[in-house]
């Protein structure tokens, strides 16, 4: 079944603002085995010009996957999750996320297309402070694998 193209432009929001904390940053840095002191040591981060520890560059995936998850879970989108693979991920930063930031995330379906028997779903997640300052845009492309050709 094809992805419902009527969903192009549909947006999903986090149910509440997300507080970026030192603990969450450290846990994420631990999970990706990154010992960078900018993610762990407030004094080191302040010496580098930040107000507190900063999050690793891929940290926003936590927020963008929430929006993507809402889209994927919508039965009317008609996306067969058993056939989904992650195709691409990009981040466009205005500045790093820092401990103490309280942010919102709005994920929008920006493209749906077919290519070589597969379908591609692109989602853009705009992450901003609750005061409206843009921090980062996360762009996720999911590939819904088509059926294998008959006889293979």
Curated annotation (Swiss-Prot):
Q: Which domain of life is it from?
A: Bacteria
Q: Which organism is it from?
A: Thermobifida fusca (strain YX)
**In this protein, which residues make up the domain named MaoC-like?**
7-116
Q: Name one GO molecular function term.
A: (3R)-hydroxyacyl-[acyl-carrier-protein] dehydratase activity
What PANTHER family does the annotation carry?
Answer: HYDROXYACYL-THIOESTER DEHYDRATASE TYPE 2, MITOCHONDRIAL, HYDROXYACYL-THIOESTER DEHYDRATASE TYPE 2, MITOCHONDRIAL-RELATED
Give GO terms for biological process.
fatty acid biosynthetic process
**SUPFAM superfamilies annotated for this entry?**
Thioesterase/thiol ester dehydrase-isomerase
Designated name of the protein: UPF0336 protein Tfu_2666
């Amino acid at each position: 079944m094809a992805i419902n193209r009527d969903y192009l432009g549909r947006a999903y929001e986090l149910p509440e603002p997300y507080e970026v904390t030192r603990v969450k940053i450290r846990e994420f840095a631990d999970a990706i085995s990154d010992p960078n002191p900018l993610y762990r040591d407030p004094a080191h981060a302040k010496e580098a010009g930040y107000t507190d520890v900063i999050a690793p560059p891929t940290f926003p995936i936590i927020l963008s996957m929430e929006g993507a998850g809402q889209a994927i879970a919508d039965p009317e989108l008609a996306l067969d999750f058993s056939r989904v693979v992650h195709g691409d991920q990009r981040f466009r930063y205005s500045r790093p996320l820092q401990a103490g930031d309280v942010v919102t995330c709005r994920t929008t379906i920006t493209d749906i297309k077919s290519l070589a028997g597969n379908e591609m779903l692109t989602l853009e997640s705009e992450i901003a402070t609750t005061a409206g300052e843009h921090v980062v845009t996360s762009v996720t492309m999911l590939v819904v694998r088509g059926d294998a050709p008959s006889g293979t």
